[in-house]
């Protein structure tokens, strides 16, 4: 491709509204342009990367036995009503009517459509297992689109759905897809972790997220220093270590009129925060016990996903308001504690090991100091309620936990029969009776993959594609002052034609630009291999080579250039 025949839309300055690196560089590199909030045009450089990512995904999905289909973006409301999600899905679901006043949605996901398709096309257990996938546009009406294509309203996704007669069959395909996803992200050159995850609004049982580690990520990824354990922070088990120490002082009631938060209590009374607890009041699952107290250490954070799994706690978790708390307990939120508490309490594992701690007295403006379990207050039920922190023991007993930010680029679920039962998707079983199919679901955010690769691989000059396979071009030919040197132009043209004939994805910068501008543009868009042709070097029989990823520069004899290039491109 010649730049003179290409839409080469690089920018020198970073747009003010671009907050994260990937958004900034995708705009500067001329990969995308905004059209409306959360909607983007993909320009030639961007679409080249996107298509290469899709190619890798297709190849690995096909190797894993999945079969490609294509389903409509526009979906009839009846399918969503049948699954029950018409009423469950929030405002992210864009609903509209056609000219016949029939309700439709722009698909944020395709569980309903694929279930309807398979129940029409598959009638016997002999046709299963079956794994179908598509690469298709999705739309979610995000309340606050941000970070460019990282969280946009319209995006491209690879979604696959598998159908089975047994849980064992689903598990086998799930394991295959886990490996397929690992292969995809390894080929993309991404530093990622496959983590245990919550199933969220899609539902189901087992679930793994594939998280690309990056400081701009929205998720906390927890992993062990000495094993392959990894989990989303929502699911990472918090292990309490040590033993409860014997009391060393008598419990006493202290006036604390100006200490309504843990921070104020610690500062005003010079207490170690590890010797304080905080009491959070949430709605109960049972109308006979409308309020429940959750007690965690003062420096820990409540894990709402874990807490709402306790049978006494309402799911989804909902905090009680000040009026409800005051009416039931007689004190405000800054003075709550375990002593003389008149509602059920659940304490975190770490709290169960505490002694001589401080907590609210359930009297406004007062706290108890030197509280001890059993001696001063009966030990409540113990449950894992908190988020893990860095340095906690790994739940598998190997090493300690590290926490890094992650960008979710893939998610696999064992859906079970959530959709097939609701939509009566059955096949004839071996015994001749109707059998409800068991389902799996496997998604990759294709556009998000592009952004996450940039988040993880860039420098002050621009993008560094982690794999030659996804760079917009593999080789850049940069002839300096070509329009003033017949020798440079002739050699550049010959090299361009030769590389093209060898199937190399090459961009030939034939613009009438200063060399500095040409170098800057090629580095900005991240071309892995740059061949610089200058008149003086050419007279000496040499060509300059630059490697974007390693920063390597070397002079190569022009007679050996092709063989050296072929060697450097051998990973393709």
UniProtKB/Swiss-Prot annotation:
An individual GO BP term: prolyl-tRNA aminoacylation
PROSITE patterns xref list: AA_TRNA_LIGASE_II
InterPro entries, sorted: aa-tRNA-synt_IIb, aa-tRNA-synth_II, aa-tRNA-synth_II/BPL/LPL, Anticodon-bd, Anticodon-bd_dom_sf, Pro-tRNA-ligase_IIa, Pro-tRNA-synth_IIa_bac-type, Pro-tRNA-Synthase_IIa_type1
GO cellular component: cytosol
Coiled coil: none
Protein name stated in the entry: Proline--tRNA ligase
The encoding gene: proS
Predominant localisation class: cytoplasm
Leader sequence residues: none
Catalytic activity field: tRNA(Pro) + L-proline + ATP = L-prolyl-tRNA(Pro) + AMP + diphosphate
Family: Belongs to the class-II aminoacyl-tRNA synthetase family. ProS type 1 subfamily.
Entry-linked PANTHER family: MITOCHONDRIAL RIBOSOME PROTEIN L39/PROLYL-TRNA LIGASE FAMILY MEMBER, PROLINE--TRNA LIGASE
Subcellular location: Cytoplasm
Gene3D superfamilies named in the record: Anticodon-binding domain (3.40.50.800), Bira Bifunctional Protein, Domain 2 (3.30.930.10)
Top EC group: ligase
UniProt keyword annotations, A-Z: Aminoacyl-tRNA synthetase, ATP-binding, Cytoplasm, Ligase, Nucleotide-binding, Protein biosynthesis
Domain note: Consists of three domains: the N-terminal catalytic domain, the editing domain and the C-terminal anticodon-binding domain.
A Gene Ontology molecular function term of the record: ATP binding
